[in-house]
């Protein structure tokens, strides 16, 4: 996730001049687990950008049976940053964005070791795991270099958060390392 090659590729996909790591996380869907409701990523984060990008790396085969990701094509163009939460209802996001209700989501199975990239504003969710095994993935969210703090704590540690004011540039290399710049 820290490699300049991956940063360069991700930056070109996002159409930005530089990328910093926002955060990474493991996503483990247990056996017979419920679906993950459709949601957007950026509204949760401590910056506001239409150009943030996430890489989702399958550690196990992600299949229709064990909860692969689903994307709603073109939904990143909605450009709203309202945090509507990840509800219990898989389709609750469409109550807020009714204009996208009839756009068919596309399942994206991916083999172990494969990766998906998505814009932080694309509607996405994951199917149920209908198997006795785990469905594991690792994600890394990248923010464009130069993003500013929007007042949301999200994953920022309290010590760093205490130093920030709304509008401050999130350029702390210890917290959000620069992985690539054009």
Which stretches of residues belong to each language-model region?
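Double-stranded beta-helix
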Residues: 62-123, 147
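Short acidic (Asp/Glu) patches
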Residues: 3-7, 31-43
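Non-heme Fe(II)/2-oxoglutarate
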Residues: 85-86, 115-117, 121-182
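Short connector loops at helix/strand junctions that flank enzyme active sites
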Residues: 21, 31-33, 50-52, 135
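Short, surface-exposed loop/helix-turn segments at secondary-structure junctions
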Residues: 40, 88-102, 134, 153-159
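Signature of the catalytic double-stranded beta-helix
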Residues: 1-24, 48, 59
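Short, conserved beta-strand element in jelly-roll/cupin
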Residues: 39, 46-64, 109-111, 117, ...
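Active-site region of the double-stranded beta-helix
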Residues: 16-19, 31, 42, 47-48, ...
């Amino acid at each position: 996730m820290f490699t300049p090659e991956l940063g360069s590729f991700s930056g070109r996909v996002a159409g930005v001049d530089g990328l910093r790591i926002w955060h990474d996380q493991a996503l483990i869907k247990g056996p017979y687990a419920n679906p993950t409701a459709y949601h957007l990523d950026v509204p949760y984060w401590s910056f506001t950008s239409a150009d943030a990008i996430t890489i989702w790396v399958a550690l196990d085969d992600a299949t229709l049976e064990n909860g692969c990701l689903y994307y709603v094509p073109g939904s990143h163009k909605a450009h709203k940053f309202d945090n509507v939460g990840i509800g219990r209802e898989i389709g609750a996001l469409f109550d807020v964005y009714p204009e996208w209700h009839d756009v068919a989501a596309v399942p994206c199975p991916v083999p172990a070791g494969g990766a998906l990239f998505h814009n932080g504003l694309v509607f996405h969710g994951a199917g149920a795991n209908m198997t006795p095994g785990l469905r594991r993935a690792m994600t890394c969210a990248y923010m464009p270099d130069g993003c500013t703090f929007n007042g949301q704590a999200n994953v920022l540690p309290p010590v760093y958060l205490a130093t920030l004011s709304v509008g401050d540039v999130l350029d702390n290399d210890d917290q959000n390392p620069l992985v690539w710049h054009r």
